[in-house]
């Protein structure tokens, strides 16, 4: 697969460094965030979070024209969803905490509006078992004109995979490039596409 344009949904502690690393390899990266302040800050070549070396990579990537940010999703070859998945409030002390996937669902809706045949969608957010399949279901509901791996397997129009972030604040720029990655695709083709994408900088 050719990944000329990569979109990262969610420009926080994982999404922004990920965007910057792809852009540093001279890939066109479109970062998407709901915060206009975040978007404006990044487009001015600055950062809104504290992370060593990130400001230098972002500034160069923006100045070189490889990184831009927006509040609305735009067409791309690959989409990485890196939004928060906080725990929902527990009802009582015996309840098991459950993750809130509403941000993922909102990101899916945003991506679905510009999705096209051949695209790859990766969930990077820390998520529970079954979340990647759920994401594929949500995408299919939004785009019945496209086929997805949970129904069409290897022949699907869209590739879907999971690659959870595995970095520690303070060392993100180094770890995002050096740490081993665990990639799980809904099919072999999905996994292969995700591996090819991350090989750009890992």
Predicted regions and their residues:
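Conserved N-terminal Rossmann-fold NAD(P) cofactor-binding segment
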Residues: 2-5, 28, 34-78, 82-98, ...
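Glycine-rich Rossmann-fold phosphate-binding loop(s) that bind the pyrophosphate
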Residues: 11-12
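N-terminal Rossmann-fold NAD(P) dinucleotide-binding loop
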Residues: 15-16
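Gly/Ala-rich phosphate-binding loop of Rossmann-like dinucleotide-binding domains
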Residues: 19, 23-24
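Glycine-rich, N-terminal phosphate-binding loop of Rossmann-like dinucleotide-binding domains
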Residues: 82-83, 125, 186
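Rossmann-like NAD(P)(H) cofactor-binding subdomain of soluble oxidoreductases
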Residues: 87-166
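Internal alpha-helical scaffold of NAD(P)-dependent oxidoreductase catalytic cores
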Residues: 138-163, 167-202
